Structures are given as C-alpha cells and as structure tokens.
Amino acid sequence: LGTRLITGFGKQLRFGGEVMKNVAGYDLSRLMAGSFGCLGVITEVSLKVLPKPRQSLSLRLPLDAEHALAKLAEWGQQPLPISAASHDGQALHLRLEGGEGSVAAARERLGGEPLDPLYWQQLNEQELPFFRDPRPLWRLSLANNSPLLALPGEQLIDWGGAQRWLKSSASAEAIRTAVAAVGGHASCYAADHCDSPFQPLAAPLLHYHRQLKAQLDPQGIFNPGRMYAEV
C-alpha cells in the first residue's frame, strides 16, 4: 500500500499510505517492488494482509499443458475458489481456498486427486525436480490466456498461466522473440547465458526509465546497471 525510502539525494520520502484507496503522494510504491534496489533504499513498507482461509485443499488433475491452459481460461470466468494453479509438465495442480462449503462444492465439480500442499512451497522455493535441470532458467511473463509457446526445452506453468518457467538452451534472442510475439517478456536467470537478464526496452520505455532514475538517484548510487547497463 505504501513505502518510505531514502533517495539518492539523502532525503526520506513517502509514497502511498497505510489504508486502501489512499491518495497521499504519487503512487510510486508499486515501482519500488520491481526496481531491484535501483531507485532507493526502502526503509518501511505498508502491506495489505488477508485472513487465512477457513478451508484449503490442493488437487492434482491429469491434464496436459494445452488442455490445462484451456481449462484455466474457462474456470477463470466462473466463481470458483481457485487461489493457485500450476502445471509441472505432467499434471495440473490446483489450490482451492475459502469457506468449507465452497471448497467442497468446487472439489466435487473439478474432480482430481488430493495433492500434498507442500507442493506450493516447493514451487515457490524452486525445489521441484523441474528446477534441477542443468539448462538455463528463464522466467516468462505474459497474459494468462496466452497459448503454450513452441520453445525448445521444458516449461512449468504458474500463476494460472501468467508466469511460466522455462529450462532451455535456446538463444536469448529466440526466446525473447517468441515471448514478445504474444505481448510478454522474458527474464534470464543464468548470468553466463545472456548479456542482460531483462528484456531489452524499446527507446520510449528506456527514456522513461532514465528519467525516473534521474529524479530519484541522479548520481547513480543505487545498484547501477543492475537492470540495464544504460540506467
């Protein structure tokens, strides 16, 4: 909801607030979450928290990736208590959360077999067998209704299709071109496999990045070159 940070000028600024629909200051707090420490030192964060669901149930459904994406698009238009969805290349994994009645009704409708909830922690910590593949790791960010990309290697679908992990030896150019064709971008998690970890920016976007950096950190003190060499 809000942040406090120290800028390159040595000033402490506050963006956002501590309640929903707060209009105090410019809404730059969201930018800080993905800035990798390039815009300032975060000293305080205000977060929105939610109560723990009364019921949680994880399921495994034997669907291939293409059919899983189609089902997720269909279920996304329906009032189902799906809080997480992932496909590990073998099956679709779902987490249902909410009231006892709604979770039970969804289980009856969707079918599947029980899944150890530890799966979600292992996915979050990248401890699943998929991540042991020695090939370079890529994070693909794209619309959740994007089709399965025809890229060499293995893919793991997360966030209901909006985040996809790729293990592939394909070139950075080939991967980023394929992802850009569906309106997404690709980040490389193998430092020795690509020149920059992030998708190259178009000239107008790079201009905005430079201007924002100049406003908060004109001396280039904070993490210079971490995101882009030009910033």
What does each of the following model-derived ranges do?
Residues 6, 44, 95-97, 166-168:
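Short beta-strand-to-turn element immediately C-terminal to the catalytic PLP-Schiff-base lysine
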Residues 1-81:
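FAD-binding subdomain of flavoenzyme oxidoreductases
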Residues 14, 103-105, 224:
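Short helix/loop capping segments that flank catalytic or ligand/cofactor-binding pockets
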Residues 2, 84-86, 154-156:
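Short, surface-exposed charged micro-motifs
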Residues 54-118:
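A conserved active-site cap/scaffold subdomain adjacent to cofactor or substrate pockets
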Residues 24-26, 105, 176:
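A short, polar/proline- and glycine-enriched secondary-structure boundary/capping micro-motif
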Residues 89, 113-231:
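Conserved glycine-rich FAD pyrophosphate-binding loop
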